[in-house]
Regions:
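Long C-terminal subdomains/extensions of small-metabolite kinases
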Residues: 1-166
Length: 166
C-alpha cells in the first residue's frame, strides 16, 4: 500500500543510506543523498501504463500520487490525491542543476531528462534488481513492481466544527 510516493533507483538508495546512518535530520539526509549521488548509476527499465510501453535508461522511476517528498522536493507538480490516477516520473538523467531546479523552483522539468506519464495501472521490470522504497520506508531490492490506483480506498473522517450542524 502506497499513499504518497514510491520509487526505484536513486531516491530509494538515498533512503537505504539514510537508514544506515546514525545521524538523523536534514544533515543526515543530505549526507545520504550526497553518498548516493556519488555512487549513482542508471538502470534499464521497461514499464507499461494503461496506454503505452516504454523502455529506457533511468536514474530513478517514481510512482507518485502526491506532489512532494517529505524533504520538500516537489517531484510531481501535477499530482492530485483525488484524481483517480497516479503519475509515473521517469528520471532519465540527474544533474546537479536539475536537482537544484526541482528543489528550489517551480520551473518545468527538462523533458530530455525527466518525463511524466499518468496512469491507473503500471507494471515495471528492470534487468537487474534495484533499490525500492514506499512512503519513505526502504523495501529492499526488486526487479518487478505492479501498481494500481484503488479509487476511494481511504475514507477520512474529521470532527464537525462548532459552526456545522450535526
Amino acid at each position: 500500500l502506497c499513499i504518497h510516493l514510491a520509487d526505484i533507483g536513486y531516491n530509494a538508495y538515498v533512503v537505504k543510506k539514510f537508514d544506515d546512518l546514525p545521524q538523523r535530520g536534514m544533515w543526515g539526509y543530505a549526507k545520504a543523498a550526497w553518498q548516493a549521488f556519488l555512487n549513482r548509476g542508471k538502470m534499464e527499465v521497461t514499464f507499461k501504463t494503461d496506454e503505452e510501453q516504454i523502455t529506457s535508461q533511468a536514474a530513478m522511476v517514481v510512482l507518485a500520487n502526491a506532489t512532494m517528498y517529505g524533504t520538500g522536493v516537489k517531484i510531481n507538480p501535477e499530482g492530485k490525491l483525488d484524481d483517480d490516477v497516479f503519475e509515473v516520473i521517469l528520471v532519465k538523467e540527474f544533474s546537479v542543476m536539475e536537482i537544484l531546479k526541482i528543489r528550489f523552483t517551480s520551473l518545468p522539468f527538462n523533458p530530455n531528462k525527466i518525463e511524466t506519464f499518468k496512469t491507473r495501472e503500471l507494471s515495471i521490470t528492470t534487468k537487474k534488481r534495484v533499490h525500492f522504497q514506499v512512503d519513505g520506508e526502504y523495501m529492499g531490492k526488486v526487479s518487478r513492481i505492479a501498481a494500481e490506483i484503488i479509487t476511494d480506498a481511504i475514507k477520512i473522517i474529521v470532527p464537525a466544527t462548532d459552526n456545522e450542524p450535526q
